[in-house]
Design a protein with these regions (language model features):
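Positively charged n-region of N-terminal signal peptides that target proteins for export
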Residues: 1-4, 21
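Bacterial N-terminal signal peptides
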Residues: 7-17
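Bacterial Sec-dependent signal peptides at the C-terminal "C-region" and cleavage site
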Residues: 16-26
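Gly/Pro-enriched, hydrophobic low-complexity segments
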Residues: 20, 165-284
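Flexible, processing/modification-adjacent segments and terminal tails
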Residues: 24, 28-35, 42, 110-186, ...
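N-terminal mature ectodomain segment of secretory-pathway/periplasmic proteins
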Residues: 39-120, 154-164
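Short, surface-exposed beta-strand/loop "edge" segments at domain boundaries and coil↔beta transitions
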Residues: 65-71, 96-103, 119-124, 183-187, ...
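Short amphipathic beta-strand/extended segments with alternating polar/hydrophobic composition
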Residues: 73-76, 103-108, 120-132, 216, ...
Length: 285
């Protein structure tokens, strides 16, 4: 009798171990970009729910904070993020006469950005105008935008490559490299949570060359300008069947000469879908 009980326990233990091994993915198992994409789309909502939110308006409050290299105080103000199909608008009104707003829009054809009272573009406006294809291709704004590139990726003539896991703020994220003939010198990486597959971070590295000379009789020399823009998305909430981030943070670093950095942080509090949006909304000056 004792021998039968012992054999039963051994058999039961073997079954438990076998089940545990079958349920645990192999550590060396590599995901594909297609698998990450499929799971990411499911994290947003059903195709039916997403289709009902092709017109979106998000309203909230934001702040602009100088992090390095800029002299000035933190600015605050109201924020609006609107989109319909591929059209997009991002506006942050700020409490400063010298730096009154951030404005960027895309009407399906042209990217426009607001200008400062001096006639110059803001650092963010300059970056987005120079690297306008991240807006035209639907990458900027991530899942906040109805034109998010991953919603209709097959039609974008672009490529995704799975680049493994990467540490970010003490957590591991799935990394996808995005490439397209339209992105030029831009290096674009997209990051996703390992458990929910929500898109939580985009990184854009942009390098451009300027011809510089202090003497018109001499040949100009090339000087590189390197920029990095990071978008962060968090505080996800289900709104009318779609899961969207309520907190949106942009961080722009300019590595020319001395490193400078600015941060725009937004907290959305109101979401409106099915709004009728005028075409004029998606052009700013």
């Amino acid at each position: 009798m004792k021998k039968i009980i012992t054999l039963t326990i051994i058999a039961f233990t073997f079954c438990i171990n076998s089940f545990g091994q079958a349920a645990t993915p192999q550590k060396n198992e590599k995901l594909t970009a297609e698998e990450v994409l499929t799971k990411h789309l499911a994290s947003i909502g059903t195709p039916e729910a997403i289709a009902k939110t092709k017109s979106r308006v998000m309203v909230g409050n934001g702040r602009l904070t100088p992090l390095r290299g800029f002299i000035g105080k933190t600015l605050t103000g109201a924020v609006q993020f609107a989109s319909v199909d591929d059209n997009l608008l991002f506006v942050m009104m700020l409490n400063s006469k010298e730096y009154p707003y951030e404005k960027v829009a895309f009407n399906g054809r042209d990217v426009t950005v607001g200008k400062m009272p001096t006639g110059d573009r803001s650092p963010l406006g300059e970056f987005l105008k120079s690297a306008s294809n991240i807006i035209k291709q639907g990458i900027f704004g991530g899942a906040l935008s109805s034109g998010w590139v991953l919603l209709n990726f097959d039609s974008k003539n672009a490529k995704l490559e799975y680049a493994g896991l990467e540490n970010s703020n003490n957590r591991k994220l799935h990394k996808l490299r995005f490439s397209s003939s339209k992105t030029g010198t831009l290096k674009i990486n997209l990051y996703f949570e390992t458990d929910t597959y929500r898109h939580v971070l985009s990184e854009y590295q942009y390098t451009t060359s300027l011809s510089i000379t202090s003497d018109p009789t001499q040949s100009s020399r090339q000087k590189e300008k390197r920029f990095t823009l990071i978008e962060q998305f968090s505080d996800f909430s289900n709104v009318e069947g779609v899961t969207l981030p309520q907190t949106y943070i942009l961080n722009l670093t300019n590595e020319e000469d001395n490193v400078t950095a600015l941060e725009w942080a937004v907290k959305f509090s109101q979401f409106y879908f099915k709004e009728t949006l005028s075409a004029d909304l998606f052009k700013v000056s």
